[in-house]
Protein backbone atom coordinates (compact mmCIF):
# COMPACT_ATOMS: atom_id res chain seq x y z
CA UNK A 1 0.00 0.00 0.00
CA UNK A 2 1.33 3.43 -1.00
CA UNK A 3 1.21 6.53 1.24
CA UNK A 4 0.51 9.83 -0.50
CA UNK A 5 0.35 13.33 0.99
CA UNK A 6 -1.69 15.83 -1.02
CA UNK A 7 -3.61 19.10 -0.94
CA UNK A 8 -7.17 19.07 -2.33
CA UNK A 9 -7.46 21.57 -5.18
CA UNK A 10 -10.83 20.65 -6.67
CA UNK A 11 -13.66 18.26 -5.84
CA UNK A 12 -14.98 16.88 -9.14
CA UNK A 13 -17.73 14.67 -7.75
CA UNK A 14 -19.05 13.69 -4.34
CA UNK A 15 -21.97 11.44 -3.46
CA UNK A 16 -23.28 12.60 -0.06
CA UNK A 17 -25.13 9.32 0.36
CA UNK A 18 -22.18 6.93 0.29
CA UNK A 19 -19.22 9.32 0.44
CA UNK A 20 -17.73 8.27 -2.89
CA UNK A 21 -15.57 11.17 -4.04
CA UNK A 22 -13.50 12.09 -7.07
CA UNK A 23 -11.07 14.94 -6.48
CA UNK A 24 -8.02 16.59 -7.98
CA UNK A 25 -5.09 17.15 -5.66
CA UNK A 26 -1.62 18.66 -5.68
CA UNK A 27 1.21 16.30 -4.72
CA UNK A 28 4.79 17.42 -4.17
CA UNK A 29 7.12 16.56 -7.10
CA UNK A 30 4.15 15.97 -9.43
CA UNK A 31 3.89 18.55 -12.21
CA UNK A 32 0.16 18.02 -12.75
CA UNK A 33 -2.78 17.49 -10.41
CA UNK A 34 -3.54 13.85 -9.64
CA UNK A 35 -6.99 12.23 -9.53
CA UNK A 36 -7.94 10.64 -6.20
CA UNK A 37 -11.02 8.43 -5.73
CA UNK A 38 -12.46 6.79 -2.64
CA UNK A 39 -14.76 7.30 0.32
CA UNK A 40 -13.54 10.79 1.21
CA UNK A 41 -16.67 12.29 2.70
CA UNK A 42 -16.32 15.73 4.28
CA UNK A 43 -12.98 16.65 2.71
CA UNK A 44 -12.82 20.19 1.38
CA UNK A 45 -10.79 22.24 -1.05
CA UNK A 46 -7.59 23.11 0.79
CA UNK A 47 -7.66 19.97 2.98
CA UNK A 48 -4.26 18.37 3.49
CA UNK A 49 -4.73 14.60 3.28
CA UNK A 50 -2.51 11.67 4.15
CA UNK A 51 -3.76 8.85 1.91
CA UNK A 52 -3.09 5.13 1.86
CA UNK A 53 -3.97 3.17 -1.25
CA UNK A 54 -2.69 2.20 -4.70
CA UNK A 55 -2.48 3.59 -8.21
CA UNK A 56 -4.89 2.17 -10.76
CA UNK A 57 -5.25 2.83 -14.49
CA UNK A 58 -8.88 3.21 -15.65
CA UNK A 59 -9.38 2.81 -19.43
CA UNK A 60 -11.74 5.78 -19.56
CA UNK A 61 -10.26 8.09 -16.91
CA UNK A 62 -6.56 7.25 -16.87
CA UNK A 63 -4.28 7.07 -13.83
CA UNK A 64 -6.06 7.36 -10.46
CA UNK A 65 -5.03 6.97 -6.85
CA UNK A 66 -7.57 4.75 -5.09
CA UNK A 67 -7.58 5.73 -1.42
CA UNK A 68 -8.48 2.97 1.04
CA UNK A 69 -7.57 4.89 4.21
CA UNK A 70 -7.06 8.55 4.86
CA UNK A 71 -6.63 11.14 7.54
CA UNK A 72 -6.65 14.90 7.41
CA UNK A 73 -3.78 17.02 8.69
CA UNK A 74 -4.01 20.73 9.18
CA UNK A 75 -2.41 23.00 6.55
CA UNK A 76 0.75 24.71 7.82
CA UNK A 77 1.22 27.60 5.38
CA UNK A 78 -0.70 30.88 5.30
CA UNK A 79 -1.80 30.12 1.73
CA UNK A 80 -2.97 26.62 2.68
CA UNK A 81 -4.86 27.83 5.76
CA UNK A 82 -6.65 30.57 3.79
CA UNK A 83 -7.68 28.14 1.06
CA UNK A 84 -8.81 25.60 3.66
CA UNK A 85 -10.98 28.07 5.58
CA UNK A 86 -12.43 29.64 2.43
CA UNK A 87 -13.55 26.31 0.95
CA UNK A 88 -16.96 26.35 2.68
CA UNK A 89 -15.77 24.04 5.44
CA UNK A 90 -16.74 26.49 8.19
CA UNK A 91 -20.23 28.00 8.19
CA UNK A 92 -19.94 31.78 8.22
CA UNK A 93 -16.49 31.85 6.62
CA UNK A 94 -16.16 32.33 2.88
CA UNK A 95 -13.08 33.37 0.87
CA UNK A 96 -13.44 37.02 1.97
CA UNK A 97 -13.53 36.35 5.71
CA UNK A 98 -10.92 33.61 5.39
CA UNK A 99 -8.52 36.19 3.97
CA UNK A 100 -9.26 38.64 6.81
CA UNK A 101 -8.80 35.99 9.51
CA UNK A 102 -5.51 34.73 8.09
CA UNK A 103 -4.18 38.28 7.67
CA UNK A 104 -4.97 38.87 11.34
CA UNK A 105 -3.55 35.66 12.85
CA UNK A 106 -1.24 34.20 10.18
CA UNK A 107 -0.11 30.64 10.85
CA UNK A 108 -1.75 30.74 14.31
CA UNK A 109 -5.22 30.93 12.70
CA UNK A 110 -6.26 27.32 13.31
CA UNK A 111 -5.00 27.42 16.90
CA UNK A 112 -7.09 30.55 17.52
CA UNK A 113 -10.22 28.88 16.09
CA UNK A 114 -9.56 25.75 18.15
CA UNK A 115 -8.59 27.30 21.50
CA UNK A 116 -9.37 31.03 21.54
CA UNK A 117 -12.43 31.51 19.34
CA UNK A 118 -13.38 34.80 21.01
CA UNK A 119 -10.25 36.41 19.54
CA UNK A 120 -11.98 36.25 16.16
CA UNK A 121 -13.85 39.38 17.29
CA UNK A 122 -10.61 41.23 16.49
CA UNK A 123 -11.20 40.54 12.77
CA UNK A 124 -13.03 43.40 10.98
CA UNK A 125 -16.66 42.46 10.21
CA UNK A 126 -16.87 39.47 12.57
CA UNK A 127 -19.36 39.80 15.43
CA UNK A 128 -20.65 37.57 18.21
CA UNK A 129 -23.18 35.79 15.96
CA UNK A 130 -20.58 34.87 13.33
CA UNK A 131 -18.12 33.76 16.02
CA UNK A 132 -20.75 31.36 17.40
CA UNK A 133 -21.44 30.01 13.89
CA UNK A 134 -17.72 29.41 13.39
CA UNK A 135 -17.39 27.74 16.81
CA UNK A 136 -20.35 25.38 16.21
CA UNK A 137 -19.24 24.50 12.69
CA UNK A 138 -15.65 23.82 13.80
CA UNK A 139 -16.86 21.51 16.59
CA UNK A 140 -19.11 19.66 14.15
CA UNK A 141 -16.21 19.09 11.75
CA UNK A 142 -14.06 17.81 14.61
CA UNK A 143 -16.73 15.36 15.73
CA UNK A 144 -17.30 14.04 12.21
CA UNK A 145 -13.56 13.55 11.74
CA UNK A 146 -13.38 11.70 15.07
CA UNK A 147 -16.20 9.45 13.90
CA UNK A 148 -14.35 8.87 10.62
CA UNK A 149 -11.14 7.91 12.42
CA UNK A 150 -13.08 5.53 14.67
CA UNK A 151 -14.76 3.86 11.69
CA UNK A 152 -11.48 3.67 9.79
CA UNK A 153 -9.73 2.08 12.77
CA UNK A 154 -12.47 -0.55 12.90
CA UNK A 155 -12.41 -1.35 9.19
CA UNK A 156 -15.71 0.35 8.35
CA UNK A 157 -16.33 2.71 5.44
CA UNK A 158 -16.04 6.35 6.48
CA UNK A 159 -19.01 7.12 4.23
CA UNK A 160 -21.28 6.45 7.24
CA UNK A 161 -19.68 9.20 9.35
CA UNK A 162 -22.05 12.03 8.40
CA UNK A 163 -25.13 9.80 8.86
CA UNK A 164 -23.92 8.71 12.29
CA UNK A 165 -23.23 12.29 13.33
CA UNK A 166 -26.63 13.45 12.07
CA UNK A 167 -28.27 10.74 14.19
CA UNK A 168 -26.26 11.04 17.41
CA UNK A 169 -24.50 14.42 17.25
CA UNK A 170 -21.73 14.92 19.81
CA UNK A 171 -22.62 11.59 21.44
CA UNK A 172 -21.63 9.64 18.30
CA UNK A 173 -18.45 8.04 19.65
CA UNK A 174 -20.04 7.16 23.00
CA UNK A 175 -23.06 5.62 21.26
CA UNK A 176 -20.91 3.52 18.93
CA UNK A 177 -18.75 2.24 21.79
CA UNK A 178 -21.68 1.58 24.12
CA UNK A 179 -23.77 -0.40 21.61
CA UNK A 180 -22.69 -0.42 17.95
CA UNK A 181 -25.71 -2.59 17.10
CA UNK A 182 -28.01 0.36 17.81
CA UNK A 183 -26.77 1.86 14.54
CA UNK A 184 -28.36 -1.03 12.63
CA UNK A 185 -31.75 0.04 14.07
CA UNK A 186 -31.28 3.79 13.75
CA UNK A 187 -29.32 4.43 10.56
CA UNK A 188 -30.36 3.34 7.08
CA UNK A 189 -27.48 1.64 5.26
CA UNK A 190 -25.75 0.32 8.37
CA UNK A 191 -26.64 -3.31 8.85
CA UNK A 192 -25.90 -6.01 11.36
CA UNK A 193 -22.66 -7.15 9.73
CA UNK A 194 -21.14 -3.65 9.77
CA UNK A 195 -22.12 -3.16 13.41
CA UNK A 196 -20.90 -6.66 14.30
CA UNK A 197 -17.48 -5.91 12.81
CA UNK A 198 -17.14 -2.90 15.11
CA UNK A 199 -18.49 -4.83 18.10
CA UNK A 200 -16.01 -7.66 17.68
CA UNK A 201 -13.09 -5.22 17.61
CA UNK A 202 -14.48 -3.57 20.74
CA UNK A 203 -14.54 -6.94 22.49
CA UNK A 204 -18.29 -7.64 22.64
CA UNK A 205 -19.06 -11.25 23.58
CA UNK A 206 -20.51 -13.44 20.83
CA UNK A 207 -23.55 -14.21 22.97
CA UNK A 208 -24.11 -10.67 24.25
CA UNK A 209 -27.84 -9.87 24.26
CA UNK A 210 -27.46 -6.77 22.06
CA UNK A 211 -25.60 -8.85 19.45
CA UNK A 212 -28.11 -11.71 19.44
CA UNK A 213 -31.01 -9.25 19.29
CA UNK A 214 -29.51 -7.42 16.31
CA UNK A 215 -28.77 -10.70 14.52
CA UNK A 216 -32.36 -11.88 14.94
CA UNK A 217 -33.68 -8.56 13.58
CA UNK A 218 -31.26 -8.85 10.65
CA UNK A 219 -32.44 -12.40 9.91
CA UNK A 220 -36.08 -11.31 9.87
CA UNK A 221 -35.24 -8.32 7.66
CA UNK A 222 -33.49 -10.62 5.18
CA UNK A 223 -36.53 -12.89 5.10
CA UNK A 224 -38.70 -9.82 4.47
CA UNK A 225 -36.42 -8.91 1.55
CA UNK A 226 -37.19 -12.39 0.17
CA UNK A 227 -40.91 -11.60 0.41
CA UNK A 228 -41.83 -13.17 3.76
CA UNK A 229 -44.06 -11.23 6.14
CA UNK A 230 -43.15 -13.51 9.07
CA UNK A 231 -40.88 -16.43 9.92
CA UNK A 232 -41.86 -19.67 11.61
CA UNK A 233 -40.12 -19.74 14.97
CA UNK A 234 -38.09 -22.92 14.28
CA UNK A 235 -36.91 -21.51 10.94
CA UNK A 236 -35.91 -18.20 12.54
CA UNK A 237 -34.02 -19.88 15.40
CA UNK A 238 -32.04 -22.08 13.00
CA UNK A 239 -31.14 -19.23 10.63
CA UNK A 240 -30.20 -16.82 13.43
CA UNK A 241 -28.07 -19.44 15.21
CA UNK A 242 -26.18 -20.09 11.97
CA UNK A 243 -25.61 -16.37 11.33
CA UNK A 244 -24.54 -15.60 14.90
CA UNK A 245 -22.62 -18.84 15.50
CA UNK A 246 -24.53 -19.12 18.76
CA UNK A 247 -26.34 -21.88 20.66
CA UNK A 248 -30.01 -22.26 19.76
CA UNK A 249 -30.88 -22.08 23.46
CA UNK A 250 -29.37 -18.57 23.58
CA UNK A 251 -31.42 -17.56 20.53
CA UNK A 252 -34.61 -18.86 22.18
CA UNK A 253 -33.94 -16.87 25.38
CA UNK A 254 -33.23 -13.72 23.36
CA UNK A 255 -36.33 -14.25 21.25
CA UNK A 256 -38.51 -14.61 24.35
CA UNK A 257 -37.14 -11.35 25.74
CA UNK A 258 -37.67 -9.52 22.42
CA UNK A 259 -41.29 -10.68 22.35
CA UNK A 260 -41.75 -9.57 25.97
CA UNK A 261 -40.26 -6.17 25.07
CA UNK A 262 -42.60 -5.98 22.02
CA UNK A 263 -39.61 -5.72 19.67
CA UNK A 264 -41.22 -8.69 17.89
CA UNK A 265 -44.72 -10.14 17.80
CA UNK A 266 -45.50 -13.85 18.12
CA UNK A 267 -48.73 -15.24 16.68
CA UNK A 268 -49.96 -18.83 16.54
CA UNK A 269 -50.96 -19.73 12.97
CA UNK A 270 -52.28 -22.76 11.11
CA UNK A 271 -49.64 -24.70 9.22
CA UNK A 272 -50.16 -26.45 5.89
CA UNK A 273 -48.61 -29.80 6.91
CA UNK A 274 -49.76 -32.31 9.52
CA UNK A 275 -48.68 -29.94 12.29
CA UNK A 276 -51.83 -28.15 13.39
CA UNK A 277 -50.26 -24.94 14.64
CA UNK A 278 -46.94 -23.11 14.46
CA UNK A 279 -45.59 -19.96 16.05
CA UNK A 280 -45.03 -17.13 13.58
CA UNK A 281 -42.62 -14.32 14.47
CA UNK A 282 -43.28 -10.89 12.96
CA UNK A 283 -41.51 -7.59 12.81
CA UNK A 284 -44.17 -5.23 14.25
CA UNK A 285 -44.56 -3.20 11.03
CA UNK A 286 -45.53 -6.31 9.04
CA UNK A 287 -47.78 -7.70 11.76
CA UNK A 288 -49.82 -4.53 12.03
CA UNK A 289 -49.90 -4.13 8.24
CA UNK A 290 -51.17 -7.70 7.74
CA UNK A 291 -53.74 -7.33 10.52
CA UNK A 292 -54.78 -3.99 9.05
CA UNK A 293 -55.24 -5.45 5.56
CA UNK A 294 -57.28 -8.42 6.80
CA UNK A 295 -59.45 -6.31 9.10
CA UNK A 296 -60.16 -3.58 6.56
CA UNK A 297 -60.99 -6.01 3.74
CA UNK A 298 -63.44 -7.79 6.03
CA UNK A 299 -65.11 -4.52 7.06
CA UNK A 300 -65.29 -3.35 3.43
CA UNK A 301 -66.94 -6.59 2.32
CA UNK A 302 -69.52 -6.51 5.13
CA UNK A 303 -70.51 -2.84 4.86
CA UNK A 304 -73.17 -1.87 2.29
CA UNK A 305 -72.09 0.25 -0.66
CA UNK A 306 -73.23 3.86 -0.71
CA UNK A 307 -73.86 4.11 -4.46
CA UNK A 308 -76.99 4.13 -6.67
CA UNK A 309 -76.28 0.77 -8.31
CA UNK A 310 -76.11 -1.00 -4.96
CA UNK A 311 -79.39 0.50 -3.77
CA UNK A 312 -81.08 -0.18 -7.13
CA UNK A 313 -80.14 -3.87 -6.94
CA UNK A 314 -81.21 -4.12 -3.29
CA UNK A 315 -84.61 -2.65 -4.19
CA UNK A 316 -84.99 -4.90 -7.26
CA UNK A 317 -84.16 -8.01 -5.23
CA UNK A 318 -86.67 -7.09 -2.56
CA UNK A 319 -89.38 -6.48 -5.17
CA UNK A 320 -88.73 -9.68 -7.13
CA UNK A 321 -87.62 -11.92 -4.29
CA UNK A 322 -84.68 -12.94 -6.49
CA UNK A 323 -81.55 -12.67 -4.31
CA UNK A 324 -79.24 -13.53 -7.24
CA UNK A 325 -80.54 -10.69 -9.43
CA UNK A 326 -77.81 -8.56 -11.02
CA UNK A 327 -77.43 -6.28 -14.03
CA UNK A 328 -78.20 -7.16 -17.66
CA UNK A 329 -74.82 -7.80 -19.31
CA UNK A 330 -76.31 -7.67 -22.82
CA UNK A 331 -76.88 -3.93 -22.36
CA UNK A 332 -73.26 -3.50 -21.27
CA UNK A 333 -72.09 -5.37 -24.38
CA UNK A 334 -74.04 -2.93 -26.54
CA UNK A 335 -72.43 0.02 -24.78
CA UNK A 336 -68.83 -1.21 -25.21
CA UNK A 337 -69.42 -2.94 -28.60
CA UNK A 338 -67.99 -6.17 -27.29
CA UNK A 339 -69.21 -9.74 -26.81
CA UNK A 340 -68.26 -11.37 -23.53
CA UNK A 341 -68.00 -15.07 -22.82
CA UNK A 342 -69.89 -16.49 -19.83
CA UNK A 343 -67.01 -16.13 -17.35
CA UNK A 344 -66.47 -12.49 -18.32
CA UNK A 345 -70.20 -11.82 -18.06
CA UNK A 346 -70.19 -13.46 -14.64
CA UNK A 347 -67.36 -11.12 -13.59
CA UNK A 348 -69.42 -8.07 -14.61
CA UNK A 349 -72.48 -9.36 -12.75
CA UNK A 350 -70.42 -10.16 -9.64
CA UNK A 351 -68.79 -6.72 -9.72
CA UNK A 352 -72.23 -5.12 -9.69
CA UNK A 353 -73.25 -6.88 -6.47
CA UNK A 354 -69.89 -7.08 -4.65
CA UNK A 355 -68.14 -4.69 -2.30
CA UNK A 356 -64.77 -6.46 -2.74
CA UNK A 357 -63.99 -8.64 -5.75
CA UNK A 358 -60.92 -10.14 -7.43
CA UNK A 359 -60.56 -10.53 -11.20
CA UNK A 360 -57.60 -12.72 -12.11
CA UNK A 361 -56.24 -14.54 -15.14
CA UNK A 362 -53.12 -15.05 -17.19
CA UNK A 363 -51.96 -12.94 -20.14
CA UNK A 364 -54.40 -12.71 -23.04
CA UNK A 365 -57.41 -13.94 -21.06
CA UNK A 366 -59.35 -10.69 -21.32
CA UNK A 367 -58.79 -8.98 -17.96
CA UNK A 368 -58.63 -5.56 -19.62
CA UNK A 369 -61.76 -6.00 -21.76
CA UNK A 370 -63.64 -7.40 -18.77
CA UNK A 371 -62.54 -4.41 -16.70
CA UNK A 372 -63.92 -2.16 -19.44
CA UNK A 373 -67.29 -3.90 -19.08
CA UNK A 374 -67.24 -3.51 -15.29
CA UNK A 375 -66.49 0.21 -15.69
CA UNK A 376 -69.31 0.58 -18.23
CA UNK A 377 -71.74 -1.06 -15.78
CA UNK A 378 -70.73 1.30 -13.00
CA UNK A 379 -70.83 4.37 -15.25
CA UNK A 380 -74.35 3.53 -16.45
CA UNK A 381 -75.47 4.22 -12.87
CA UNK A 382 -73.38 7.37 -12.53
CA UNK A 383 -70.81 5.95 -10.12
CA UNK A 384 -67.58 7.88 -9.53
CA UNK A 385 -64.74 5.54 -10.48
CA UNK A 386 -61.11 5.78 -9.36
CA UNK A 387 -58.43 3.82 -11.24
CA UNK A 388 -54.92 3.06 -10.02
CA UNK A 389 -51.96 0.73 -10.50
CA UNK A 390 -48.64 0.18 -8.70
CA UNK A 391 -46.42 1.60 -11.46
CA UNK A 392 -46.53 4.53 -13.85
CA UNK A 393 -46.42 2.25 -16.88
CA UNK A 394 -49.32 0.12 -15.62
CA UNK A 395 -51.34 3.26 -14.86
CA UNK A 396 -50.66 4.59 -18.36
CA UNK A 397 -51.85 1.32 -19.94
CA UNK A 398 -54.96 1.47 -17.80
CA UNK A 399 -55.71 5.01 -18.97
CA UNK A 400 -55.24 4.02 -22.62
CA UNK A 401 -57.52 0.98 -22.26
CA UNK A 402 -60.37 2.67 -20.36
CA UNK A 403 -60.27 6.30 -21.46
CA UNK A 404 -60.33 7.33 -17.78
CA UNK A 405 -57.45 8.79 -15.81
CA UNK A 406 -55.52 6.19 -13.85
CA UNK A 407 -52.93 7.12 -11.24
CA UNK A 408 -50.13 5.31 -9.51
CA UNK A 409 -51.13 4.20 -6.03
CA UNK A 410 -48.60 6.60 -4.52
CA UNK A 411 -50.08 9.51 -6.49
CA UNK A 412 -53.62 8.44 -5.63
CA UNK A 413 -52.69 8.48 -1.94
CA UNK A 414 -50.87 11.82 -2.40
CA UNK A 415 -47.55 10.55 -1.10
CA UNK A 416 -45.39 13.46 0.09
CA UNK A 417 -42.09 12.33 1.63
CA UNK A 418 -41.16 12.55 4.42
CA UNK A 419 -44.68 13.27 5.75
CA UNK A 420 -46.12 10.15 4.10
CA UNK A 421 -49.54 9.58 2.54
CA UNK A 422 -51.96 12.51 2.71
CA UNK A 423 -54.89 10.21 1.95
CA UNK A 424 -55.66 7.99 4.95
CA UNK A 425 -58.43 7.06 7.38
CA UNK A 426 -58.72 10.71 8.46
CA UNK A 427 -58.70 12.03 4.88
CA UNK A 428 -60.19 9.22 2.75
CA UNK A 429 -60.52 8.91 -1.00
CA UNK A 430 -63.61 10.39 -2.63
CA UNK A 431 -65.44 8.02 -4.96
CA UNK A 432 -67.81 5.08 -5.27
CA UNK A 433 -65.46 2.47 -6.75
CA UNK A 434 -61.70 1.89 -6.74
CA UNK A 435 -60.30 -0.45 -9.39
CA UNK A 436 -56.65 -1.47 -8.97
CA UNK A 437 -54.75 -3.21 -11.79
CA UNK A 438 -51.55 -5.30 -11.55
CA UNK A 439 -52.35 -6.14 -7.92
CA UNK A 440 -49.78 -8.94 -7.78
CA UNK A 441 -47.16 -6.17 -7.53
CA UNK A 442 -48.63 -4.66 -4.34
CA UNK A 443 -46.81 -5.58 -1.12
CA UNK A 444 -48.31 -5.76 2.37
CA UNK A 445 -47.19 -2.33 3.57
CA UNK A 446 -48.53 -0.53 0.48
CA UNK A 447 -51.81 -2.47 0.53
CA UNK A 448 -52.33 -1.48 4.15
CA UNK A 449 -51.76 2.20 3.32
CA UNK A 450 -54.16 1.93 0.37
CA UNK A 451 -56.93 0.27 2.36
CA UNK A 452 -56.66 2.84 5.15
CA UNK A 453 -57.67 5.50 2.61
CA UNK A 454 -60.76 3.62 1.37
CA UNK A 455 -64.04 4.60 3.08
CA UNK A 456 -66.19 1.63 4.06
CA UNK A 457 -68.95 2.59 1.60
CA UNK A 458 -66.59 2.34 -1.40
CA UNK A 459 -66.30 -0.72 -3.63
CA UNK A 460 -62.90 -2.32 -4.35
CA UNK A 461 -62.07 -4.35 -7.47
CA UNK A 462 -58.63 -6.00 -7.52
CA UNK A 463 -57.31 -7.07 -10.94
CA UNK A 464 -54.13 -9.04 -11.52
CA UNK A 465 -52.34 -12.24 -12.50
CA UNK A 466 -51.32 -14.28 -9.46
CA UNK A 467 -48.83 -16.25 -11.56
CA UNK A 468 -46.74 -13.19 -12.31
CA UNK A 469 -43.72 -12.46 -10.13
CA UNK A 470 -44.92 -11.31 -6.71
CA UNK A 471 -44.23 -7.89 -5.23
CA UNK A 472 -40.68 -6.76 -4.51
CA UNK A 473 -41.67 -5.95 -0.93
CA UNK A 474 -42.85 -8.48 1.64
CA UNK A 475 -46.19 -10.14 1.16
CA UNK A 476 -47.99 -12.05 -1.59
CA UNK A 477 -51.17 -10.09 -0.99
CA UNK A 478 -53.27 -10.88 -4.07
CA UNK A 479 -52.68 -14.63 -3.80
CA UNK A 480 -53.45 -14.57 -0.07
CA UNK A 481 -56.72 -12.71 -0.68
CA UNK A 482 -57.74 -15.30 -3.28
CA UNK A 483 -56.64 -18.26 -1.12
CA UNK A 484 -58.61 -16.94 1.86
CA UNK A 485 -61.86 -17.94 0.12
CA UNK A 486 -63.64 -15.01 1.79
CA UNK A 487 -64.12 -12.77 -1.24
CA UNK A 488 -65.68 -13.41 -4.68
CA UNK A 489 -63.02 -14.31 -7.24
CA UNK A 490 -63.46 -14.63 -11.01
CA UNK A 491 -60.72 -16.54 -12.85
CA UNK A 492 -60.45 -15.93 -16.59
CA UNK A 493 -58.99 -18.97 -18.36
CA UNK A 494 -59.83 -18.65 -22.06
CA UNK A 495 -57.01 -17.32 -24.25
CA UNK A 496 -58.59 -15.09 -26.88
CA UNK A 497 -57.76 -15.27 -30.57
CA UNK A 498 -55.70 -12.06 -30.61
CA UNK A 499 -53.51 -13.37 -27.77
CA UNK A 500 -53.09 -16.78 -29.44
CA UNK A 501 -50.86 -15.14 -32.06
CA UNK A 502 -48.36 -14.23 -29.32
CA UNK A 503 -45.91 -17.05 -28.60
CA UNK A 504 -44.84 -15.22 -25.44
CA UNK A 505 -48.39 -15.49 -24.09
CA UNK A 506 -48.87 -19.08 -25.25
CA UNK A 507 -45.53 -20.14 -23.75
CA UNK A 508 -46.34 -18.36 -20.49
CA UNK A 509 -49.52 -20.42 -20.20
CA UNK A 510 -47.68 -23.61 -21.16
CA UNK A 511 -45.08 -23.09 -18.43
CA UNK A 512 -47.82 -22.29 -15.93
CA UNK A 513 -49.52 -25.58 -16.81
CA UNK A 514 -46.27 -27.52 -16.37
CA UNK A 515 -45.71 -27.99 -20.12
CA UNK A 516 -42.49 -27.39 -22.02
CA UNK A 517 -42.68 -24.15 -24.06
CA UNK A 518 -42.45 -24.04 -27.85
CA UNK A 519 -38.87 -22.86 -28.52
CA UNK A 520 -38.86 -23.24 -32.30
CA UNK A 521 -37.88 -20.09 -34.19
CA UNK A 522 -39.84 -18.71 -37.11
CA UNK A 523 -40.93 -15.55 -38.85
CA UNK A 524 -43.67 -13.24 -37.59
CA UNK A 525 -43.30 -14.30 -33.98
CA UNK A 526 -42.51 -12.45 -30.76
CA UNK A 527 -40.62 -15.34 -29.14
CA UNK A 528 -37.15 -16.54 -30.12
CA UNK A 529 -34.78 -19.02 -28.52
CA UNK A 530 -31.09 -18.44 -29.21
CA UNK A 531 -28.58 -20.84 -27.70
CA UNK A 532 -24.97 -19.79 -27.02
CA UNK A 533 -22.58 -22.04 -25.12
CA UNK A 534 -19.86 -19.38 -24.80
CA UNK A 535 -20.79 -16.54 -22.38
CA UNK A 536 -18.79 -13.94 -24.35
CA UNK A 537 -20.70 -14.86 -27.51
CA UNK A 538 -23.95 -14.55 -25.57
CA UNK A 539 -23.03 -10.99 -24.54
CA UNK A 540 -22.18 -10.07 -28.14
CA UNK A 541 -25.51 -11.53 -29.32
CA UNK A 542 -27.47 -9.58 -26.69
CA UNK A 543 -25.74 -6.33 -27.68
CA UNK A 544 -26.45 -7.01 -31.37
CA UNK A 545 -30.13 -7.73 -30.68
CA UNK A 546 -30.63 -4.61 -28.56
CA UNK A 547 -28.64 -2.29 -30.81
CA UNK A 548 -29.71 -3.48 -34.26
CA UNK A 549 -32.11 -6.39 -34.76
CA UNK A 550 -34.93 -5.69 -32.30
CA UNK A 551 -35.22 -1.94 -33.02
CA UNK A 552 -35.26 -2.62 -36.77
CA UNK A 553 -37.64 -5.60 -36.70
CA UNK A 554 -40.15 -4.24 -34.16
CA UNK A 555 -39.74 -0.52 -34.97
CA UNK A 556 -38.87 0.06 -31.30
CA UNK A 557 -36.04 2.37 -30.14
CA UNK A 558 -33.29 0.61 -28.19
CA UNK A 559 -34.01 2.64 -25.05
CA UNK A 560 -37.45 0.98 -24.89
CA UNK A 561 -35.86 -2.47 -24.64
CA UNK A 562 -35.14 -4.13 -21.29
CA UNK A 563 -32.64 -6.93 -20.77
CA UNK A 564 -33.33 -9.37 -17.93
CA UNK A 565 -30.73 -11.72 -16.46
CA UNK A 566 -31.06 -14.03 -13.44
CA UNK A 567 -27.67 -13.09 -11.98
CA UNK A 568 -25.76 -9.99 -10.87
CA UNK A 569 -22.19 -11.22 -11.36
CA UNK A 570 -20.46 -13.15 -14.12
CA UNK A 571 -19.98 -12.52 -17.84
CA UNK A 572 -23.72 -12.59 -18.54
CA UNK A 573 -24.61 -10.98 -15.22
CA UNK A 574 -26.26 -7.58 -14.89
CA UNK A 575 -23.04 -5.70 -14.03
CA UNK A 576 -21.12 -6.85 -17.10
CA UNK A 577 -24.12 -6.62 -19.45
CA UNK A 578 -24.69 -3.02 -18.37
CA UNK A 579 -21.08 -2.15 -19.23
CA UNK A 580 -21.27 -3.88 -22.62
CA UNK A 581 -24.59 -2.23 -23.49
CA UNK A 582 -23.39 1.20 -22.39
CA UNK A 583 -20.25 0.86 -24.49
CA UNK A 584 -22.37 -0.04 -27.53
CA UNK A 585 -25.33 2.30 -27.03
CA UNK A 586 -24.14 5.24 -24.95
CA UNK A 587 -20.32 5.31 -24.91
CA UNK A 588 -20.08 9.02 -24.01
CA UNK A 589 -22.55 8.85 -21.14
CA UNK A 590 -21.57 9.02 -17.49
CA UNK A 591 -21.61 5.72 -15.68
CA UNK A 592 -24.05 5.30 -12.80
CA UNK A 593 -22.87 3.90 -9.47
CA UNK A 594 -25.10 1.67 -7.40
Q: What do the predicted segments below correspond to?
A:
Residues 1, 5, 46, 78, ...:
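Amphipathic alpha-helical transducer elements in NTP-driven molecular machines
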Residues 1-309, 313-317:
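Accessory, non-ATPase domains that flank or precede helicase/AAA+ motor cores in DNA-metabolism machines
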Residues 21-33, 413, 573-587:
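Short, basic/aromatic beta-hairpin or loop at an interaction surface
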Residues 115-116, 123-124, 217, 335, ...:
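Charge-dense polyanion-binding interfaces
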Residues 311-317, 321, 325-336:
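Conserved adenine-nucleotide phosphate-binding loops and their immediately adjacent elements
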Residues 316-321, 466-594:
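Conserved helicase motor core of P-loop NTPases
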Residues 327-356:
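Conserved pre-motif I regulatory segment
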